[in-house]
Amino acid sequence: YWTNDFKPNYFSWHDFLQKDEIAIDAISDFITRGVIVINDAPSISNSLEELATRLGPIREVLFERIHNVSVDGHVYNIAHTSLELPPHNDFASYTWPPSVQALHMLVNDCEGGRSTIVDGYAVLRDLRNDYPEHFDILSNFAVPFREFDEENETYANEPMIRLNAEKEITGFRYSNQLMQMIDPKKKNVDAFYEAYHELCNRVNSEKYKSKFRLESGHILLVSAHRVLHGREEFKPDGKRHLQDAYYEMDNIENNLVLLKTSGNK
């Protein structure tokens, strides 16, 4: 697990796609730490399609296969403004949210707007140690999340923390933007909000935020059930265009096994 002194490792786009030994190193690091940056990628729209040979097929969502992020005054999503975007993960409104996200910076000519990432597992580990009762309620209390537009609707009612049979953390669902109103008469709602307040304070604490600038040709790859992403406010005095797409960790882990075994044939 890591906190604010963490810096992701960088891997060349060309080497990642063309050299199996580099792909093995990059994917292994990604699975272990939850984040890598691929640099020197083409600043060309839809280049994320080319990562399928290493990451597996793009995970389709209802809205767009590859999503464009730039300042647009006609949408409701805070990502399309120049305001600070707090740490979150995407599509908490899916029963199974995409487990990997790639954010490809095509152009970044604006001042400010550093990317922020948070190791959600580090936050939850510390919360579990300090306030086990908060951790327990967040692991069991179902929370509604919704994302929709004129044509599509996604809705999930799930706890924010996912555990396996051994009570190990296997997923973190966190999005203030998509979280919906909770029935005030629901059992344990007061305990939930007390725990949620503590969780929000930690997620937004400088203690956990790693910050760095994504330049043109950089692709930030995050393990989306673990790592939250966001950005600082920026001045919309130039062009800033980012594209993102989703993949699945199961496919990436499978590809790593194939890469390792193919070298032994």
Predicted regions and their residues:
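Active-site environment of non-heme Fe oxygenases that use a 2-His-1-carboxylate facial triad
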Residues: 2-35, 40, 45-265
